[in-house]
């Protein structure tokens, strides 16, 4: 039974159905997949558990040269054999945590992120089963954990700072979350944190307790507007 006293399965289905309906309003498909950048994709795995929606995160292995020990979503660079950007995200999720493509229902592709003048990261939100047991690849992943989606709107520990990149000011959120299962505290920041905030707002439709990058009244248009401005600046430097 759920905390509401209702059977778990109907509660999960209701949560996921509502999430899908809201996310699909923000699906841009392959609108920007033609842009000439180095292509990366990430998967934001969404799971309904104990009457709440959660996001699944990984902690990068300390053995990795780039960003060791940082919290992120499963993802990586596109391979020539990947059919599209979504295939990249699914392949990387399988390699990193053992999540097979048939275990994911990809719901939407969000507005991509430009992290420098030549690297485009495309985020996908996918639903996964509440019974999924992660199998971290120790060469790439140190740990896997879940965070309630609502935490990214009303956190216990949050900070933010501003950075200027490609001629535009960006908000970088920094969250600290202590996993109640083992007491481990994780820091979630940068693009990963920003995407978590965006997805939480889209699905839960509640105002966050802090400033955000996007316009709360027109999330999609404001996200695309900023992306296109940064894209224009990036291409002018090539």
Curated annotation (Swiss-Prot):
It catalyses: hexanoyl-CoA + H2O = hexanoyl-4'-phosphopantetheine + adenosine 3',5'-bisphosphate + 2 H(+); octanoyl-CoA + H2O = S-octanoyl-4'-phosphopantetheine + adenosine 3',5'-bisphosphate + 2 H(+); butanoyl-CoA + H2O = S-butanoyl-4'-phosphopantetheine + adenosine 3',5'-bisphosphate + 2 H(+); decanoyl-CoA + H2O = decanoyl-4'-phosphopantetheine + adenosine 3',5'-bisphosphate + 2 H(+). InterPro entries: CoAse (IPR045121), NUDIX_hydrolase-like_dom_sf (IPR015797), NUDIX_hydrolase_dom (IPR000086), NUDIX_hydrolase_NudL_CS (IPR000059). The modification N6-succinyllysine is found at residue 20. Inhibited by fluoride. A motif (Nudix box) lies at residues 77-98. Residues 37-172 form the Nudix hydrolase domain. The keyword Metal-binding applies. Expressed in liver, kidney, pancreas, pituitary, small intestine, spleen, heart and placenta. Weakly expressed in brain. PROSITE patterns: NUDIX (PS51462), NUDIX_COA (PS01293). Coiled coil: none annotated. The record marks 66 as: Important for coenzyme A binding. It is found in: Peroxisome. A motif (Microbody targeting signal) lies at residues 236-238. It comes from the Eukaryota. Its EC number is 3.6.1.-, 3.6.1.77. One of its GO terms (biological process) is coenzyme A catabolic process. Its main location: other. One of its GO terms (molecular function) is coenzyme A diphosphatase activity. Its cofactor is Mn(2+); Mg(2+). GO terms for cellular component: cytosol; peroxisomal matrix; peroxisome. It holds the Pfam family NUDIX. PANTHER family: NUDIX HYDROLASE, PEROXISOMAL COENZYME A DIPHOSPHATASE NUDT7. Fatty acyl-coenzyme A (CoA) diphosphatase that hydrolyzes fatty acyl-CoA to yield acyl-4'-phosphopantetheine and adenosine 3',5'-bisphosphate. Cleaves CoA, CoA esters and oxidized CoA with similar efficiencies. Preferentially hydrolyzes medium-chain acyl-CoAs and bile acid-CoAs. Has no activity toward NDP-sugars, CDP-alcohols, (deoxy)nucleoside 5'-triphosphates, nucleoside 5'-di or monophosphates, diadenosine polyphosphates, NAD, NADH, NADP, NADPH or thymidine-5'-monophospho-p-nitrophenyl ester. This is Peroxisomal coenzyme A diphosphatase NUDT7. It comes from Homo sapiens.
């Amino acid at each position: 039974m759920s905390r509401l006293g209702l059977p778990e399965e109907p509660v999960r289905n209701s949560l996921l159905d509502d999430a899908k309906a809201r996310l699909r309003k923000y699906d841009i498909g392959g609108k920007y997949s033609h842009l000439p950048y180095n292509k990366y994709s990430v998967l934001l795995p969404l799971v309904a558990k104990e009457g709440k929606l959660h996001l699944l995160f990984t902690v990068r292995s300390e053995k990795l040269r780039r960003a060791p020990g940082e919290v992120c979503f499963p993802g990586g660079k596109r391979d020539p054999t990947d059919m599209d950007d979504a295939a990249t995200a699914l392949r990387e999720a399988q390699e990193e945590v053992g999540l097979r493509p048939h275990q994911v229902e990809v719901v939407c592709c969000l507005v991509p992120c430009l992290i420098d003048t030549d690297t485009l990261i495309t985020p996908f939100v996918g639903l996964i089963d509440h019974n999924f047991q992660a199998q971290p690849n120790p060469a790439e992943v140190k740990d896997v954990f879940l965070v309630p989606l609502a935490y990214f709107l009303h956190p216990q520990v949050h900070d933010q700072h501003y950075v200027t990149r490609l001629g535009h000011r960006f908000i970088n959120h920094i969250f600290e979350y202590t996993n109640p299962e083992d007491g481990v505290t994780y820091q979630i920041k940068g693009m990963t944190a920003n995407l978590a905030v965006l997805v939480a707002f889209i699905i839960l439709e509640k105002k966050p307790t802090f400033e955000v990058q996007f316009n709360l009244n027109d999330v999609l248009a404001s996200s695309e507007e900023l992306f296109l401005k940064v894209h224009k600046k990036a291409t002018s430097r090539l």
